[in-house]
Amino acid sequence: MSAISSLVLIGWAMCLENSYKYYDPVLQPTNFYKPSTAAFLESRPLMFAPEQLSRNAILHNPVAFGEGNFYKLLYPSMTRLTSYLNDHSPLFGDWYRSPSLIMSKSDKEEVISGLYKAQPKGDKDLKEFWGFIMGELLIRDLPELKKSLGELKGIQNEERKKKSVAEFKDIADQKDNDENSFFGTAWFILDCLSLGVSNRNAEIYGDVIGPFVDAAIAFKSLEHNFSNIIGSSRSMSSYRTNSTEQIGSKK
C-alpha cells in the first residue's frame, strides 16, 4: 500500500469524523513520514478520488466510523514505522510498494537481519530506531488504541443485532467478512507493537525489531481491509437509497 493510498484512506477516516459533529478526537501531529523517493509516492494510483471522498462523507455507518477513527489513531505510529523500514530496508520497500499483502518467511527474516545490521555502530539498545518511531509516544498511545478497538467491537456487535437475517444479504456477508478481517488484523498489530515495546523495556534488544516488522506487514493488509469496507459501505448506502426511491415511486 503506497503513501498516497494511505493518505487517501486517512482522508476517508477524517470525512467519517466530520459526518459526526459531536465527536472531535485530537490527533497528534507528525512530520516524520517523508518517503525518500518520488517513485514511492507515484508507484500506485489513488483508490478514491477527492470528489469520491466528499460523497463518502454522507455515509452514516457506525461501524465504518469506528474503523475510521481507529485507523486515524493508528496511522501516525504506523507511518513513522513504515517510513523507517522503507528507508532502512530496500527489500521491505520493494515489497511495500508491490501489490502483495504477504511477505515470505525468508524475506521477513532477511529484512529483520538487515535492519539490525543497519543500526549505527555501538547502538545496541536501538536508540536511533526507538527515537525515529517515537517509541515513548507509542507507549502512551497503545492504551487508547486498545480502548478504541474494544469499543469498535462493541459497536460491531450492536449493529449486527439490529440487522435482519435477510437484509442486504450478499453485500452484508462480504462486509462482515471485511470487518472481521479488519478487527483481527488490528488486534494482531497492537499485539505486535506491545510485544516490541515489552522486549525493548526488558532490554531483549534482539527481539525488538521483529515484532515491529510483523506489525508493519499486517498494516498493509489492514489498509486493504479498510478500503474494502469503504466500498461495501458505499454499496449498502446505494442499495438503501435505491430501495427507498422504489418504495416512494409505488405510493
Curated annotation (Swiss-Prot):
Residues 1-15 form the signal peptide. Glycans are attached at N225, N242. Keywords: Glycoprotein, Signal. It comes from the Eukaryota. This is Uncharacterized protein ECU05_0590.
